[in-house]
């Protein structure tokens, strides 16, 4: 999902200009970093593009994507309320002050079903659930009860690495290459843009979030971000 944001090139492994010339891509560089882009936005955009590409007699390929986006495009998505930068920032500030286990306990009082699914330190999903409740007065699980509708039929394929040690070695090499290519300079430029918000959805991307958080402590960045990449790859 980070591919949609302009300026997030190195950390998202965005296709190069030469690659884009060779194989047409869509939904690249369509948002500024301070503009939200949700799974619902992705389903709407991808569905439209699939129809347009098939109308031209071509076969669309949907490549990559987080688990949320992949599930949304395969199965459809619940109709969720839109995000609010103001409420999201307020929840993030409260979580930083109280600690996310305390926020998880608050969520358990208003939405036990959602809290049961989430770890006490899953600040992104806890924050989103609290944001939804504060905006609508309804728990997040209320919206999940609505049956989703598949977006369109599709064939799903995946590559599953057999050797986890080799995978971790490749992840470490990839992250080192990103640093060598100028990831920190890229993040510094993003932080200098007007309206930059460290709590925006764009800055939740693995690597970017850690670079912003630990920008003043570069000696910690490599180990922390590499660990995040490993856990993210394992989950995917």
Locate predicted features.
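Phosphate/pyrophosphate-binding catalytic cores of soluble transferases and nucleic-acid-acting enzymes
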Residues: 1-236
């Amino acid at each position: 999902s980070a591919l949609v944001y302009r300026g997030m090139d190195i950390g998202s492994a965005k296709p190069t200009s030469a690659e884009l010339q060779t194989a047409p891509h869509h939904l690249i560089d369509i948002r500024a970093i301070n503009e939200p882009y949700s799974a619902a936005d992705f389903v709407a955009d991808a569905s439209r593009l699939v129809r347009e590409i098939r109308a031209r007699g071509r076969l669309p390929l949907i490549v990559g994507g987080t688990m949320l986006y992949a599930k949304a495009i395969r199965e459809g998505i619940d109709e969720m309320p839109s995000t609010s930068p103001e409420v999201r920032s307020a929840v993030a500030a409260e979580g930083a002050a109280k600690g996310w286990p305390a926020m998880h306990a608050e969520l358990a009082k208003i939405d036990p079903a959602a809290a049961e699914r989430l770890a006490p330190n899953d600040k992104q999903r806890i924050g989103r659930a609290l944001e939804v409740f504060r905006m609508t007065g309804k728990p997040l699980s209320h919206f999940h009860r609505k049956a989703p509708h598949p977006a369109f039929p599709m064939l799903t394929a995946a590559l599953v690495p057999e050797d986890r040690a080799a995978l971790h070695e490749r992840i470490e090499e990839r992250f080192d290459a990103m640093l060598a290519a100028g990831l920190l300079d890229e993040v510094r430029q993003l932080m200098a843009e007007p309206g930059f918000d460290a709590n925006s959805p764009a800055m939740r991307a693995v690597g970017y979030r850690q670079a912003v958080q630990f920008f003043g402590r570069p000696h910690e960045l490599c180990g922390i971000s590499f660990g995040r990449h490993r856990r993210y790859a394992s989950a995917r």
